[in-house]
Amino acid sequence: TLPIYAELVREIGGGEVEVSAIANPNEDAHFVRPKPSFARDIRSADAFVTTGLDLELWVPTLLDRAGNGDVIEGARGYITAYTGIALLDVPVSADRSGGDVHIYGNPHLTTDPLRTLQIARNITTGLKRVAPDRAAVFDAGLADFTERLYNRLFGARLVELIGGETLEQLSHGGTLFTFLEANEYEGNPLIKELGGWLARAEPFRGQDIICYHKNWAYFEDRFDVSCADYVEAKPGISPTPGHVAQLINRMKTENLDVMLAATYFDRGKVETVARRGEATLVQVPLSPGAREGIDDYFTLVETWVTELAAAFRNQ
């Protein structure tokens, strides 16, 4: 469904796969309009990767039109991204009056590198199910992706000392920084060995920001930054003038000086709120290919961390 899933398939499958994405890189996945060409692509597919929640509500219609029994829900070629992932923002009730409420939880999983790693594992499992004779290729692709992601997130030195899997478990458990501060290596706290994105995120760690839409929950969770308020008071519904006025007042009085938004939102509208609230705007893509030079998941996360850190350093 999404370009970011297509990129993960390429990472894992390499030359053994041909992959295309339905949504374009700078398109809001909620609002993709099914086209006949999409159904034709699915009709000839061996596998179909989707979030598996209620982000791509247009998927059932496409699968029905395609009529490919190998990739319908429950078939061996149907691969869900969310499997094994702890979901955030699970609503108490499924009342749509609150806007675009996702009844199963927040589906914007790929803003967290470690949850994205789990998606890569799920894709690998699915590809091996479809093409077991190429399992070794897929396992090797996943191993390479995993090593690079660990090194980019934690820093190669810390991965060498502690091990990527252990660091992943500590981070998921919310105890990574406590562990690194409490333990030493050669007389120095292990926290000094932290590198990668987590080290470079230090300028915004523990900080509050303004977000346009609730698509950064998993980024918040991994990098310890908090969306204190949203331009969209109700997800997926354009903000009212009254809400925008209240938000701008809050931004000024509470010194909420940085706003984070995806590039598929109208830049003029986002810039207006940021300017009136006297905030630095960080508007970044959510998918590889949405901006020149962002060609894979690693350069995508690099962009998020670099631009958000720069916004705080410039305050």
Segments the model singles out, each with a brief description of its role:
Residues 1-315:
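Extracytoplasmic metal-acquisition and chelation regions
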